[in-house]
Amino acid sequence: MNFVVIGKDKGDGALRRQERPAHLEYVADRQGLILYAGPLIERGRMIGSIFIFDVPDRAALDAYLADDPYFTRPIFETIEIYESRCMVPESEPGFLVAEAERSRAAT
C-alpha cells in the first residue's frame, strides 16, 4: 500500500537541524519502504517534508513513524497521512489506458 505523509514544520527549524543526522541514518537503513521523500519548499524556504511510502499496511507505516526521529520529536506542527495509489509511472503497461476506459464506462 502507498501512503503519503506530509509534515509541516514547527518553529524556526532548529529542532529539525538537530535531529536531521539521526533521521537520515534511520531513513538510509529503510530505503526500500520509501518511494520518494524530500522537503516542502515555499518561496525558497523549507516548510516541511513529504514522504511517499510503499508498505504492507497502515500498521507498518505506524511502526516506521514510531521510530523515525522526525516523528518521535516535535519537529512538525501538523502531520497529514493519506492512503494513495501510484498511477504514474504505470505499475504495469497499459494501466492508464485501462483506467481511462473504466472511468468512461462508469459515467
Residue ranges and their predicted role:
Residues 1-107:
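Conserved, structured core segments of small domains
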